[in-house]
Amino acid sequence: MIVEQIMKRDVITLTKTDTLETAICKLKEFHIRHLPVVDEERHVIGMITDRDMKQASPSIFEENKRSLFLTRSVDSIMKKDVVCAHPLDFVEEISAVFYEHGIGCLPVVHHQKLIGILTKTDLLRTFVKLTGADQPGSQIEIKVNDITKSLAEISSLCQDLQVKILSVLVYPHDDPGVKVLVFRVKTMNPLPFLQALQRNGHHVVWPSEQRDLL
C-alpha cells in the first residue's frame, strides 16, 4: 500500500504572513492539529501544530501579552525543517519515518508541491484495516521454521475447513531461525481450526492450551 491511497487530499494550509490568530481559528474550525505553511506555489516552507501554539502562547498570568501574540505572523514560530512524504512511498516505510522522527503528520509533496497530508491517525486506521482487526474474527499465532512451507500448508487447511483468512502477519521471534505467523481468521469459534493445526504438527502459541480453547 502506498501513501496516495490513504492520504487526505483536501489540506488546510497557512501562509507565512497569516497571523497566529488565523492559525488558532483554523485548528479549531476544522478540528485538526497540524497546519502546513505554503508559499504561492504550494511549496511547503513550514509546519505549525497545536502543540507549537500552546508552547508559544503566553501563560494565564500574562493575559496582557495575548493580543500581541495573536497578531504575530505564522513564520515567527513555525518549524522550517519539515519532513515530507512522496505519494508513492510505501506506508510501511513511512511508518518508520513517523517513529524515527517522533512526528504526528507528514505533508505529501509531488514535484515539490503540496498535494496531501498524512497523520498518525490515518496510519493507525490503515493498520487496523490491514490486520483485519476491524472485522469480527479470531487471532491465531503459530511458531514456524519455514515460512513458505507453513503458509502453504495452513492455507490448504483453511480451504479444507472453509475458514476465511482476513490477514497474515509475520513477527520476529527470540530465536533468529524461527518466525511467528499471525493469522486473523473470520470465525468466532477457532477450535476446529486449532485442532486441525495441531493434528498436522503445527506449533500453536496462541491461543495456548491454558486458555481453555484446546
From Swiss-Prot:
Gene of this entry: acuB
Record keyword Transcription regulation present: no
Sequence intervals crossing the membrane: none
Quaternary state and interactors: Interacts with YabA.
GO BP term (any one): acetoin catabolic process
Record InterPro entries: CBS_dom, CBS_dom_sf, Diverse_CBS-Domain
Main function: Role in growth and sporulation on acetoin or butanediol. Involved in the breakdown of these compounds used as a carbon source.
This protein's UniProt keywords: Acetoin catabolism, CBS domain, Repeat, Sporulation
PROSITE patterns, A to Z: CBS
Keyword Transport set for record: no
Protein name stated in the entry: Acetoin utilization protein AcuB
Functional pathway: Ketone degradation; acetoin degradation
Matches recorded under Pfam families: CBS (PF00571)
Domain CBS: 7-66, 78-135
SMART domains assigned: CBS
Originating organism: Bacillus subtilis (strain 168)
